[in-house]
């Protein structure tokens, strides 16, 4: 179970060059490139939005805002950085703006958790319930770091830059989170 969070098997590997090309085409007004970017990155964007907003409906709504923002601002992307990092920074900034506006931090309800399509994470209902419990045992920032690494396949250095945290902090929080999750899962299995 925990090994699922330590791989990127369920998230497509970031192909930096192809994503850069898509962003350049989007900057030129290519709607097909936007559709392709959406297909390649939607799981990662949704996962990040859900980790901030903790509400499936709000995360889906914000996800649409992200791609509208990408369409409007694609010409601002500079191909020196990670295209996925740029996209997730857009998502993060929109999440933070929404949270500031709404000032709410509700827990992910069981109904909202179940709204996540099963095929997106490759788990059956029992495994999803265990994973939900393990993730709920984490602090918000720990959960966000684990999900960014597991869902998007981002490297810890990229997560540190995205969350504006020192790399050693991200690494320690990630490893502490995995220990907490392992402890939670071993407690349930006993």
Where are these regions (language model features)?
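DNA-recognition helix of helix-turn-helix
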Residues: 92, 96, 142, 151, ...
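Structural recognition of an alpha-helix C-terminal capping motif at a helix-to-coil junction
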Residues: 47, 61-68, 72, 81-93, ...
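Conserved RNAP core-binding helix
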Residues: 18, 39-42, 46, 56-73, ...
């Amino acid at each position: 179970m925990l090994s699922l969070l330590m791989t990127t098997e369920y998230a497509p590997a970031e192909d930096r060059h192809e994503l850069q090309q898509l962003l350049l085409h989007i900057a030129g007004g290519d709607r097909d490139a936007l559709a392709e970017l959406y297909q390649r990155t939607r799981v990662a964007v949704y996962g990040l939005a859900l980790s901030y907003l903790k509400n499936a409906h709000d995360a889906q709504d914000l996800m649409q805002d992200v791609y509208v923002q990408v369409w409007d601002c694609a010409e601002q992307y500079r191909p020196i950085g990670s295209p996925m990092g740029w996209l997730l920074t857009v998502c993060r900034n929109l999440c933070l703006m929404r949270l500031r506006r709404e000032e709410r931090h509700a827990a992910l309800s069981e109904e909202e958790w179940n709204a996540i399509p099963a095929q997106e994470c490759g788990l059956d209902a029992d495994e999803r319930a265990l994973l939900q419990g393990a993730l709920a045992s984490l602090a918000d920032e720990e959960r966000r770091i684990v999900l960014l690494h597991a869902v998007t396949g981002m490297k810890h250095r990229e997560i540190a830059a995205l969350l504006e945290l020192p790399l050693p902090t991200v690494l320690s929080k990630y490893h502490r989170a995995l220990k907490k999750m392992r402890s939670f899962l071993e407690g349930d299995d006993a």
